[in-house]
Amino acid sequence: DFSGKTFKPVWQWNHNPNDKMWSLNKERKGWLRLHSMPAKQLLWAKNTLTQRAIGPVSYTSVKLDASRLKVGDEAGLGAINAPYASLGVVKTDKGLNLRCYDQNTNKEVWKPLAKSKVVWLRLWGDYDKSQLQYSYSLDGKNWENIGEQMLSPYQLKTFQGVRVALYAFNKKELNGGVAD
């Protein structure tokens, strides 16, 4: 989806974008680059790129290069709804970690990324049954579930259904690094 000069029409920004804080094929050929900006959580993160989840059942997979994240950054694959869910890579002072979060239960699962700075993230959704499951891969072929299966119920707060989201933000209220 990100090999051209413009986004395909299916993609939309979740907020008004800051055009200085993202690039498509300019800073790194063949990649979308998101510069992290301050936000406390995914729903407040600017420059979050979204599209409606394809149903009734689908997978969304992304390759994430987290090598240029800075401490406090989180970048990943979200499921925007009310409640939302996410699987991201978080940079702490001890290194990179996967963080799977379910706002519905307020549970999070952390897993250290030992040496890998590149990870594939996947969201499985059965949108008729309101079920989501995240998984990850270190090679793009072998996938391991992370966290429990989540509920993403139909609700009337946002009228949008689940929107798959690519995001990067910094919880330390700083402009951070970049996610490709």
What name fits each language-model region?
Residues D1-D180:
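Extracellular glycan-recognition regions
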